[in-house]
Curated annotation (Swiss-Prot):
Ubiquitinated by msl-2. GO terms for biological process: chromatin organization; dosage compensation by hyperactivation of X chromosome; germ cell development; oocyte development; regulation of DNA-templated transcription; regulation of hemocyte proliferation; sex-chromosome dosage compensation. Changing residue 430 to S: In strain: 639A. It comes from Drosophila melanogaster (Fruit fly). The gene is msl-3. This is Protein male-specific lethal-3.
Length: 512
């Protein structure tokens, strides 16, 4: 006869678990869930047992329910593999078509569409190697991507199709190798229900993956620490991104609008384009401010390795925070110490500050003075270099430089106002985004799908937001100098000779 005993609790409040589908009439699959509470009960024999109130992440609270431990599994890699196998067996919908975008509002017609597309093989891709970040639980656990598998056994090669209508900007395409990273909690979904966690997926390029792995190795393998405050802090990166996007949008307006055949239609078109640019720039300001708030809220719990925490917390004293704020407010040129400060005319020759003539363009500098000109030059130089050209090609007829100096006075005035914009005012209290730099910001961007999936943001707003996040990630990728070894300081945790030897080995791929 089996001896009756008190049950011991197997899971604790707040723990991430895998829960079997409670409805036995449906496919037997595992859902990523969270233990909201643990209740101690007594059975008819007076023996203790436990029930666990489970929230299926991404589902409405009305789906929360109490279950016994028999339907729960620990969140381990082995059980994640079981979750994927059960999903395969149940023939669940596999997602993975979107770059940093996936919404459950796809029309049913698209889901049912068959024909050739139903027999096209989706390439097997490897999820971004953030297993170091997750499996060791030194950063907040983020499940590995699991849904990027072949849909059948056909041998055809799937053509990659860019998402339509997402307004993605040029500059980060043409990469031969890209990996998918699904930060959604569940990597698969049933046709008749798509959990909130599956709304967003992120495509991570090899360039970004390389930077992330380099950052991880410097911290966890070589015992380095990020120099604080960062040479270019997060608030500065965000400000410069908005200014950069404003210049690119302004130039595109001029190039498109000049094709109109008559003056009246051209003016009407340009007026509409001006309104679009201004509203887009205003939205970008809100986007980066939202990212900054996310960073301030999550940096301690989600964006630091274990090896960093003591160093960071020792640095973030009130005095150091105040000093970072003072430095940023007193020296605005601190935002881009590597930027060119010499003004260049359209003919490639230096322009004397204070001059009102740039290659015959009267009044160009008078709009904003030398500071406007310097900021414009930095943005234009980025456009030229990001397009793969060298600086000598910056003065060709089709160059962005030429278009920038032909902008109407109204748009140049708007750019001047944008260049003066600050994400945080001089009166703002010290923030952590004034201290940390691009590596920690990239960690946030990798986690953003998880945060947004858990947010109540509507799908329509997500569709508007995701192209801007995609452009921001591309902007970070194009500034490798924010991630190089000059941004790290030595640690005494390892012998110096060991650090130097390991550093040389790790820099073979990144230093180029």
């Amino acid at each position: 006869m089996t001896e009756l005993r008190d049950e011991t609790p197997l899971f604790h409040k707040g723990e991430i678990v895998l829960c079997y589908e409670p409805d036995k009439s449906k496919a037997r699959v595992l859902y990523t869930s969270k233990v909201l509470n643990v209740f101690e009960r007594r059975n008819e024999h007076g023996l203790r047992f436990y029930e666990y109130k489970i929230h299926f992440q991404g589902w409405r609270p009305s789906y929360d329910r109490c279950v016994r431990a028999t339907v729960l599994l620990k969140d381990t890699e082995e059980n994640r593999q079981l979750q994927r196998e059960l999903a395969e067996a149940a023939k669940l919908q596999i997602r993975g078509d979107y770059s940093y975008k996936g919404t459950p509002d796809k029309p049913s017609a698209k889901k049912k569409r068959g024909g050739k597309a139903a027999h096209v093989e989706e390439p097997i891709v490897v999820p971004m190697d953030t297993g170091h970040l997750e499996a060791e639980h030194e950063m907040a656990p983020t499940p590995r991507a699991a849904g990027n598998r072949t849909r059948d056994n056909s041998g055809g090669k799937r053509k990659e199709k860019p998402p339509s209508g997402d307004g993605r900007l040029k500059g980060n395409r043409g990469r031969q190798t890209e990996t998918f990273y699904n930060n959604a909690i569940n990597d698969v979904s049933v046709y008749n229900h798509v959990p909130q966690e599956d709304r967003i997926m992120m495509r991570v390029s090899e360039r970004l993956r390389e930077l992330i792995e380099y950052d991880r190795n410097m911290i966890k393998v070589l015992g380095k620490q990020h120099a604080l405050p960062a040479r270019v802090p997060i608030v500065t990166i965000m400000e410069n991104f908005v200014k950069q996007q404003a210049v690119e949008l302004a130039i595109s307006i001029k190039q498109d609008s000049s094709r109109a055949r008559n003056t009246q239609s051209r003016n009407a078109r340009m007026e509409r384009e001006y309104d679009r640019v201004m509203s887009t720039v205003c939205m970008l300001k809100e986007v980066v401010d939202g990212l900054r708030i996310y960073f301030e809220f999550h940096v301690d719990d989600h964006l630091l390795y274990t090896e960093e925490k003591e160093y960071v917390h020792n640095y973030l004293t009130d005095d150091n925070m105040r000093n970072c704020s003072l430095i940023l407010n007193k020296s605005y040129e601190y935002i881009n110490p590597s930027g060119d400060t010499e003004l260049i005319g359209l003919d490639g020759t230096p322009v004397v500050e204070g001059s009102g003539d740039t290659n015959g363009q009267i009044g160009v500098i008078n709009i904003g003075g030398p500071e406007y000109e310097k900021q414009l030059q930095k943005c234009l130089l980025y456009i030229v270099t990001a397009s793969g050209k060298n600086t000598a090609q910056a003065y060709e007829r089709t160059s962005p430089y030429t278009a920038a100096y032909k902008l109407p006075v109204e748009m140049r005035g708007f750019l001047n106002e944008t260049f003066k914009w600050r994400l945080l005012s001089a009166e703002s209290p010290p923030e952590k985004s004034m201290v940390f730099g691009a590596p920690h910001l990239v960690r946030l961007m990798i986690k953003m799908p998880m945060f947004l999936n858990a947010s109540p943001i509507s799908n329509k707003k997500l569709e508007d937001l995701l192209p801007h996040l995609d452009a921001f990630i591309n902007y970070l990728e194009n500034h490798r100098e924010w991630f190089d070894r000059e941004n790290f300081v030595n640690s005494t945790a390892l012998p110096q000779e060991d650090l130097q030897r390991e550093l040389l080995d790790s820099l073979d791929g990144i230093a180029a």
